[in-house]
Amino acid sequence: RIDPEDDTDFSARFAGEISGGLSVIWERGTFPEVDILYQHINSDGVTSLDYPAFISSDPGYQYAPILSGNIENGLFAIYGDRGAGSIDLKVQKIGLDYLPDWQGTGLVAMDGLDGDVNYTQTYRIGNRDIYHVWEDNRASKKIYGSRLTDLFIEERDGKQLTYSDNSSSETDFSTPVILKTDNKIYTATFDGSSSPKFIRVNKMDENLNNAWDSSGVSLSAVFDMRNALLFETSDGVGCVWSESRGFNYNIYYQKLNENGEITLENEGVELVDSNGDDYIMAVEPSPNEDGKFMIFWMEDAWPAATLKFSKMDVEGN
């Protein structure tokens, strides 16, 4: 048991270490008073702190904590703070002593500006640098990002990364997708300004500048697209999604090169066609190092869903 208090604990997130240790961050309390706490467990299963450390104990609602990195190379706690009414994005560095390293409740990475912040992603660049990328509804839903170096934020309230319509919704599995590679960031958003809803893919350089058209590259849809996933290829990026062009949702694939040019047939290549609704779960390079990819998906067919996998090359064969 990592929390000695008899309270409500939930939304736990974890970060493992090569040494076998484990960092845990979670929410304690019930709305509207919720705090963020942290504890470290060593490789012997013993907690490193006598009592969990408060990442945030400010009045109000702090929520949705995540961890990025590890203790050895730099560990950061990221969470939303709704104590002031709008939702601020906050960051706290956790030191080698397993205690908060920055003063107070950490650094305000982005002021909420009375707009909801969703789908936050954090990517560590080096020991003292991280990217923050998120969806922000300060005026309309768009993807924003910023780079944090030590205590310096390049874009105080975030830099707008996408400019096209972003009709994200968890109801129809059309949430934005963000992929960080060695020196690029790719985004996939769902444009619902016309029917059918379709995907736009864009690429940012290491300074978060649009490398392609600011509206992104649109993928051709026959019916509404949903459940997208991006993965890196040798010459660009691949996008996989679900679409119902018949009775069920099948899985389709499109590939874009470094210049944002579509390289497969216009409406994509069909990867999976089953008797149920198919939703992509993961795409990973083949462990055989043969240049191919393992794809994993869920086939949702009565009476139960099934996890399946297959193998494909970069052209979708």
Pin down the residues of each PLM region.
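Extracellular, repeat-based ectodomains that mediate carbohydrate processing or recognition
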Residues: R1-N317
